[in-house]
């Protein structure tokens, strides 16, 4: 098939281009900077926030399937607010441009990335895809992020393309914040990520390789809707954070009184470590015939 990968320089998009080509697909890489493009059958250049540029680039590629892997999370270590603000625009404006361009170019299918950790913290510790999103989060930044996620998912569902949203778990592996040289790892190594009392917030992790594998399966499937793409072992912070510190060779995380956590860690990290819900991957396994090659974070988190 002719496949266009938007966001082809990212931690998932870059290896995804190669994985799709290895499966025999003809792959166009949509990038902002041609010098950073992976090896592809065609490279098309456009800023995803420039409607006319996107329409032109996608038209030139003539894809049957468009894969949306656009984020600005490369900015996360240096400028987190800007990274989240730009990613929100890519999820709203960028998605709208891709949907319009895909339709105009005659594509039949759209696969878009989302996140599996945007659910409201209510109900059981591990939730399925029907759980409500946390659009009314008390933190303005996180509420804006989740509203952008909701808009992306709405745009994909309301298009007349066969649309599938892959809600990725918290990514680890090369190029992520949880890599040994990533921002989260450096914070843990410096003893600057304490564990709030209880540590009951649940995280569903996902190795980058498994995100790529799920995206390939999604391109080749006819599944539609939203799917959680996560590993098999959702874990409370009280389990994964000490394990991660040991694997990195860092000191054990100190315990932090719950009342101090928001002031010292910020709202989002406190939410992740204390109240966040995990995500069940049963539907993705069934709909895509996919399963993680890294079924547990215990086997890889902090090792690469």
Curated annotation (Swiss-Prot):
Its EC number is 1.-.-.-. One of its GO terms (molecular function) is aldehyde dehydrogenase (NAD+) activity. The keyword Ribosomal protein does not apply. It catalyses: 3-diazoavenalumate + NADPH + H(+) = avenalumate + N2 + NADP(+); 3-diazoavenalumate + NADH + H(+) = avenalumate + N2 + NAD(+); (E)-3-diazocoumarate + NADPH = N2 + (E)-4-coumarate + NADP(+); (E)-3-diazocoumarate + NADH = N2 + (E)-4-coumarate + NAD(+). Coiled coil: none annotated. Keywords: NADP, Oxidoreductase. It comes from the Bacteria. PANTHER family: NAD(P)-BINDING DOMAIN-CONTAINING PROTEIN-RELATED (PTHR48079:SF6), PROTEIN YEEZ (PTHR48079). This is 3-diazoavenalumate denitrifying reductase. It comes from Streptomyces sp. The gene is avaA7.
């Amino acid at each position: 098939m002719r496949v266009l990968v938007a966001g082809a320089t990212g931690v998932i998009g870059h290896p995804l281009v190669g994985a799709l080509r290895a499966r025999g697909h003809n792959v166009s890489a949509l990038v902002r900077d041609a010098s950073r493009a992976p090896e592809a059958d065609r490279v098309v250049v456009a800023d995803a926030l420039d409607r006319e540029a996107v329409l032109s680039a996608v038209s030139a590629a003539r894809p049957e399937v468009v894969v949306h892997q656009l984020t600005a999370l490369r900015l996360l270590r240096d400028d987190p607010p800007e990274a989240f603000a730009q990613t929100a625009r890519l999820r709203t404006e960028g998605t709208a441009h891709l949907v319009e361009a895909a339709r105009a170019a005659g594509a039949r299918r759209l696969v878009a990335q989302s996140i599996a950790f945007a659910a409201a913290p209510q109900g059981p510790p591990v939730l399925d895809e029907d759980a409500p999103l946390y659009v009314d989060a008390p933190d303005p930044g996180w509420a804006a992020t989740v509203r952008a996620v909701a808009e992306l998912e709405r745009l994909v569902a309301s298009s007349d393309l066969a649309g599938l949203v892959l809600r990725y778990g918290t990514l680890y592996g090369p190029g992520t914040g949880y890599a040994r040289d990533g921002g989260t790892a450096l914070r843990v190594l410096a003893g600057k990520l304490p564990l709030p009392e209880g540590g009951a917030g649940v995280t569903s992790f996902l190795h980058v390789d498994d995100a790529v594998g799920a995206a390939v399966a999604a391109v080749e499937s006819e599944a539609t809707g939203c799917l959680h793409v996560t590993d098999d072992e959702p874990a409370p912070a009280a389990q994964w954070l000490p394990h991660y510190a040991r694997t990195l060779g860092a000191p054990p995380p100190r315990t932090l009184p719950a009342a101090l956590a928001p002031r010292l860690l910020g709202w989002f990290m406190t939410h992740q470590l204390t109240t966040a819900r995990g995500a069940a991957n049963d539907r993705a396994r069934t709909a895509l015939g996919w399963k993680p090659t890294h079924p547990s974070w215990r086997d890889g988190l902090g090792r690469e």
